[in-house]
């Protein structure tokens, strides 16, 4: 049973990200400086983040629908692009391996991959889909060793569901125009 207010935590983290971006712990340290004094512990932020990531696709779809009531969207054209975030760490994240079977259960997000700056640091890739006005519709996060080419179609399928199957023109730079992406978009 959840004993804290998820909406309160989400609201506080959103305000804090806009006003004074910090780590979750750094943000929690500023809790008493806000006019509205939230009533939750640091552990509740971490538990909320687990809930948020487990429901991220549904949450992003909900955000799109709610924000569409405030700012009408023009989804006749959808823009997609990817970027990388570098981390000043010595090595990539470890794989999580099943101790019994030896099976790799998951790979950490920070991995060595191709970055435009050719830096020797692990990276995380983010893909973002925006409407014709440049307002985000959805996003995805991937390990840095994943090609951006394989991220477009799954995110586009999610956007198609969010838009209830509405037609739109897919627009991306040449790096995101592989045969498989063009084939998917030509199928209507």
Give names to the regions the model predicted:
Residues 113-117:
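Conserved beta-alpha junction segments in alpha/beta enzyme cores
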Residues 148-188:
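An internal, acidic/charged active-site-proximal segment
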Residues 1-108, 120, 127-140, 145, ...:
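Dynamic "connector" segments at or just before major functional cores
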Residues 123-125, 179:
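Short beta-strand-initiation
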């Amino acid at each position: 049973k959840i004993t804290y207010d998820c909406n309160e935590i989400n609201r506080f983290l959103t305000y804090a990200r806009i006003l004074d971006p910090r780590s979750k712990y750094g943000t929690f340290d500023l809790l008493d400086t806000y006019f509205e004094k939230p009533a939750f512990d640091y552990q509740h932020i971490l538990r909320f983040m687990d809930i948020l990531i487990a429901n991220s696709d549904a949450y992003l779809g909900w955000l799109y629908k709610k924000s569409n009531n405030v700012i009408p969207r023009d989804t006749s054209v959808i823009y997609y692009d990817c970027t990388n975030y570098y981390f000043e760490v010595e090595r990539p994240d470890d794989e999580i391996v099943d101790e019994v079977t030896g099976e790799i259960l998951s790979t950490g997000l920070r991995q060595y991959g191709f970055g435009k700056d050719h830096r020797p640091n692990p990276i995380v890739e983010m893909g973002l889909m925006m409407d014709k006005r440049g307002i985000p519709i959805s996003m995805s996060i991937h390990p840095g060793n994943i090609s951006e080419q394989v991220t477009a179609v799954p995110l586009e399928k999610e956007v198609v569901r969010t838009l209830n199957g509405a037609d739109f023109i897919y627009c991306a730079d040449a790096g995101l125009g592989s045969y498989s992406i063009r084939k998917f978009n030509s199928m209507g």
